UniProtKB/Swiss-Prot annotation:
HAMAP family assigned: UPF0161_YidD (MF_00386)
Keyword Cell inner membrane: yes
Protein's recorded name: Putative membrane protein insertion efficiency factor
PANTHER family in the cross-refs: MEMBRANE PROTEIN INSERTION EFFICIENCY FACTOR-RELATED
Principal location listed in the UniProt entry: membrane
Length: 91
């Protein structure tokens, strides 16, 4: 794994193992913000993953009802490829 990813993931794992059990469940979302952060960094890399995590943590407050909020899929590997026919139709 990329060493820069570990710089993000290790503090989150520390939080999950040692701090979260003391504080108790507080996250309003599933997966929790800490799990979301790890998954986002693993899927999208350090910069995009960290940005997604920051946006998610900013939404986790008493004014937001929470709910299921999975990590979005990466937009760089689109399933829909543009065919030559579509290109000529758009021209």
């Amino acid at each position: 794994m990329n060493p820069f990813k570990w710089l993000i993931i290790l503090p989150v794992r520390f939080y999950q193992l040692f701090i979260s059990p003391i504080l108790g469940p507080r996250c309003r979302f599933y997966p929790t913000c800490s799990h979301y952060t790890i998954e986002a960094v693993q899927q999208h890399g350090v910069f995009c993953g960290l940005w997604l995590a920051i946006k998610r943590i900013a939404k986790c407050h008493p004014g937001n009802p929470g709910g299921v909020d999975p990590v979005p899929s990466c937009g760089c590997h689109s399933d829909k490829e543009t065919t030559p026919k579509e290109k000529s139709d758009n021209a």
